């Protein structure tokens, strides 16, 4: 097959009639390198430095550079503070009942707080704590805490455990009370992540409810059982009429 980029009279005719696309121009590597170097030259050296490096190199810049450096340093400092604020949690912390108001209800403004009321003798509570520990590391901008149920609510019934409350600005935005609402005894990490994301407490990268696949299989199984059951019943009725 003839190369469409080949320099032939026939190819030129085909290009003139629009049958062949225009010939690809070879990239000029030297031109690309020059453009890249020009772009790099426009970047001030201090824009590549860390805050510590800027401090060490202060004597090497003139007054004009120093003004720009101060602006740049302040920008970097604010970015660093914002990052530290966003990542100030990162673990599932144990609190007591008398800390509930300060740690949960009166938590920092606009901070999502997830609290798990548990009892260590209940297996699902231990599983939920394991999952929440992993989610706390994955979503450090959200506050995750746990507390023994009776230390927060006296005589709290075991049938209500595990209990997960989701707070923001002192208001309960979501709650999961008991085994069923929390996801069942075989609760998967992704399922709990999805539940908390639906409330808004975390920003998940899951694209769909992981529980949906299980539900779809169950529905399909029930539907098939119903179809086969109707078929067997029909066959039985047919045989009876004979």
UniProtKB/Swiss-Prot annotation:
SUPFAM superfamilies on file? Thioredoxin-like
Q: Where in the cell is it found?
A: Endoplasmic reticulum
The UniProt entry's GO CC annotations, sorted and at most eight, read: cytoplasm; endoplasmic reticulum
**InterPro entries in the cross-refs:** Phosducin-like_chap/apop_reg, Phosducin_thioredoxin-like_dom, Thioredoxin-like_sf
Task: State the coiled-coil residue ranges.
Answer: none
Function noted in UniProt: Essential for male fertility, spermiogenesis and acrosome formation.
What family does the entry list? Answer: Belongs to the phosducin family.
Q: What is this protein called?
A: Phosducin-like protein 2
Species of origin = Bos taurus (Bovine)
Q: What is the lineage of its organism?
A: Eukaryota, Metazoa, Chordata, Craniata, Vertebrata
């Amino acid at each position: 097959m003839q190369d469409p980029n080949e320099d032939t009279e026939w190819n030129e005719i085909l290009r003139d009639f629009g049958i062949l696309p225009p010939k690809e121009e070879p990239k000029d590597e030297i031109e690309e390198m020059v453009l890249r170097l020009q772009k790099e030259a426009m970047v001030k050296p201090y824009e590549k430095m860390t805050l510590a490096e800027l401090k060490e190199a202060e004597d090497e810049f003139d007054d004009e550079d120093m003004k720009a450096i101060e602006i740049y340093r302040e920008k970097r400092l604010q970015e660093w503070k914002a990052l530290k604020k966003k990542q100030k949690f990162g673990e599932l912390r144990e609190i007591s009942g008398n800390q509930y108001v300060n740690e949960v209800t009166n938590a920092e403004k606009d901070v999502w707080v997830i609290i798990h009321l548990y009892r260590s003798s209940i297996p699902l509570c231990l599983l939920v704590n394991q999952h929440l520990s992993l989610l706390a590391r994955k979503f450090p901008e959200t506050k995750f805490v746990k507390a023994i149920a009776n230390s927060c609510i006296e005589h709290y019934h075991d049938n209500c455990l595990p209990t997960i409350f989701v707070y923001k600005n002192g208001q309960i935005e979501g709650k999961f009370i008991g085994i069923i609402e929390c996801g069942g005894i075989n609760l998967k990490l992704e399922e709990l992540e999805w539940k908390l994301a639906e409330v808004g407490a975390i920003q998940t990268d899951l694209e769909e409810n992981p529980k949906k696949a299980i539900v779809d299989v169950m529905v399909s199984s029930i539907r098939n059982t119903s179809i086969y059951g109707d078929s067997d019943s029909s066959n039985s009725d047919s045989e009876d009429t004979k």
